[in-house]
């Protein structure tokens, strides 16, 4: 039997009918803050408000619902960093199927607990591997040994068709408001979302520029399509944007993206953190890192989108509150507002007061101070964190620190040392 490897608008239309009474029609909202910031009209497609707080339910339910009754009776499996797993769990409960869900051990606890909540007694969760790709290998082995049905998170035409229903829904909403999009920004992990969306947009909104957004530490689609012209596996990835940190995209999604995506943007993980905080404080939107990717890319395109109409897909809102400290730290590092140094500190009374008076600026704040006293030496080692009010103050701060201790170590430039602090 020939395996289907292409997706058509007809496939998406059929998926739309299957999902009509299953998924929530999420809002398409004009965002006044972003529109004012970038001097254009910015709409947000709020998939963070979906039943499982991400678009993944669309693809998971569609892929599972097309299985035969015999296949369904054998049970289903999947591998996921979180959101696809929640979609599969929700579907397993809805259709009363047995599911074994494999998740990386690095998956935020919030996502693991949500999978168990949505699936209840229909779902068994297995935590294995440090990355999605390691987790995937375990899931495929288990699926083969137990003759179950693997529900691919992105490299499956039914999954892609399900994700594509988001585009159909979005264009119908835009049409009712007499809106035409000049640009669409959407996150890329394995490529299922961008493949489904771009397939529908190229037929029904061909003048819309499709921009795929990846974290700079896991830009597997860009490296495959643009740099190598073939699917490649990244040897190392930054797992921070966990919903979009995939070392290897799908063969099917690669071909669709290569044909449909107009451009790719790589966004620094620190910029994503700044966007998460900005969206929460300015718009009261709780976005996970992958969910904030599309909005993060607007800064790269601010000259292109001026006066245009733009839509960003907020793909997910499953953020673990326990990660907020790290998110704030990464944002401050990216914005050049917080800086860490290792200093040799004089071991005499009044040394700290001298440091505060001579080194700190009037608006600088000490956020970390760890002192290791050495009884046999004249100096002790200090790790100090300083937060600025303005990143332009950094040059003068460094000059004062160098005068205080010419042998100081600036930790921000040393990824290994910095990783020990957050």
Curated annotation (Swiss-Prot):
- Keywords noted in UniProt: Amino-acid biosynthesis, Branched-chain amino acid biosynthesis, Isoleucine biosynthesis, Lyase, Pyridoxal phosphate
GO terms for biological process? isoleucine biosynthetic process; L-serine catabolic process; threonine catabolic process; threonine metabolic process
Catalytic activity annotation: L-threonine = 2-oxobutanoate + NH4(+)
Q: Which residues carry this modification: N6-(pyridoxal phosphate)lysine?
A: 56
Pathway involvement of the protein, from the record: Amino-acid biosynthesis; L-isoleucine biosynthesis; 2-oxobutanoate from L-threonine: step 1/1
One GO molecular-function annotation for this sequence? threonine deaminase activity
Which cofactors go with this protein? pyridoxal 5'-phosphate
Listed InterPro entries: ACT-like_dom_sf (IPR045865), IlvA (IPR011820), Ser/Thr_Dehydratase (IPR050147), Ser/Thr_deHydtase_PyrdxlP-BS (IPR000634), TD_ACT-like (IPR001721), TD_ACT-like_sf (IPR038110), TrpB-like_PALP (IPR001926), TrpB-like_PALP_sf (IPR036052)
Q: Does the keyword Lyase apply?
A: yes
UniProt-listed Enzyme Commission number(s):
4.3.1.19
Residue positions annotated to bind pyridoxal 5'-phosphate are: 83, 189-193, 315
Q: List the disulfide bonds.
A: none
Main enzyme class:
lyase
Q: Where is the ACT-like domain?
A: 339-413
Q: Which CDD domains match?
A: ACT_ThrD-I_2, Thr-dehyd
* Tagged with keyword Cell membrane: no
| The family this protein is said to belong to | Belongs to the serine/threonine dehydratase family.
Function in brief = Catalyzes the anaerobic formation of alpha-ketobutyrate and ammonia from threonine in a two-step reaction. The first step involved a dehydration of threonine and a production of enamine intermediates (aminocrotonate), which tautomerizes to its imine form (iminobutyrate). Both intermediates are unstable and short-lived. The second step is the nonenzymatic hydrolysis of the enamine/imine intermediates to form 2-ketobutyrate and free ammonia. In the low water environment of the cell, the second step is accelerated by RidA.
* PANTHER family per the UniProt record, alphabetical: THREONINE DEHYDRATASE, MITOCHONDRIAL, THREONINE DEHYDRATASE, MITOCHONDRIAL-RELATED
User: How does this chain assemble?
Assistant: Homotetramer.
NCBIfam families from the UniProt entry: PRK08639.1 (NF006390), THD1 (TIGR02079)
Annotated protein name in UniProt: L-threonine dehydratase biosynthetic IlvA
Q: What is the lineage of its organism?
A: Bacteria, Bacillati, Bacillota, Bacilli, Bacillales
């Amino acid at each position: 039997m020939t395996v289907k490897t292409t997706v058509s608008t007809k496939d998406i239309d059929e998926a739309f009918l299957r999902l009509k009474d299953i998924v929530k029609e999420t809002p398409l909202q004009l965002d006044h803050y972003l529109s004012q910031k970038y001097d254009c009209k910015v709409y947000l497609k709020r998939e963070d408000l979906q039943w499982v707080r991400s678009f993944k339910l669309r693809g998971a339910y569609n892929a599972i619902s097309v299985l035969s009754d015999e296949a369904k009776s054998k049970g289903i499996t999947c591998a996921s960093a979180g959101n696809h797993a929640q979609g599969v769990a929700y579907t397993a409960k809805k259709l009363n199927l047995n599911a074994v869900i494999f998740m990386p051990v690095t998956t935020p606890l919030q996502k693991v607990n949500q999978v168990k909540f949505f699936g209840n007694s229909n779902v068994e969760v297995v935590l294995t591997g440090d990355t999605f790709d390691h987790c995937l290998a375990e899931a495929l082995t288990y699926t083969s040994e137990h003759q179950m049905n693997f529900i691919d998170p992105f490299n499956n035409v039914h999954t892609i068709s399900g994700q594509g229903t988001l585009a159909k829904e979005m264009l119908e909403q835009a049409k009712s408001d007499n809106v035409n999009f000049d640009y669409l920004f959407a996150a890329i992990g394995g490529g299922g979302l961008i493949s489904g969306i771009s397939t529908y947009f190229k037929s029904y909104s061909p003048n819309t520029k499709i921009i795929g957004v990846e974290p700079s530490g896991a830009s597997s689609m860009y490296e495959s399509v643009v740099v190598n012209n073939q699917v490649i596996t990244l040897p190392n990835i930054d797992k921070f944007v966990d919903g979009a940190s995939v070392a290897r995209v799908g063969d099917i999604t690669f071909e669709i993206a290569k044909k449909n995506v107009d451009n790719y943007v790589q966004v620094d993980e620190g910029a994503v953190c700044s966007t998460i905080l900005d969206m929460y404080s300015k718009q009261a939107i709780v976005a996970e890192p992958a969910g904030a990717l599309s909005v993060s890319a607007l800064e790269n395109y601010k000259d292109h989108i001026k006066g245009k109409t733009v839509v960003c897909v907020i793909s997910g809102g499953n953020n673990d509150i326990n990660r907020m400290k790290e998110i704030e730290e990464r944002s401050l590092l990216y914005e050049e507002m917080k800086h860490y140094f290792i200093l040799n500190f004089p071991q005499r009374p009044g040394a700290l007061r001298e440091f505060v008076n001579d080194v700190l600026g009037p608006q600088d704040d000490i956020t970390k101070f760890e002192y290791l006293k050495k009884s046999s030496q004249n100096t002790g080692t200090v790790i100090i964190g300083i937060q600025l009010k303005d990143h332009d103050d950094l040059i003068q701060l460094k000059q004062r620190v160098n005068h205080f201790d010419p042998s100081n170590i600036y930790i921000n430039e040393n990824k290994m040392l910095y990783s020990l602090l957050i």
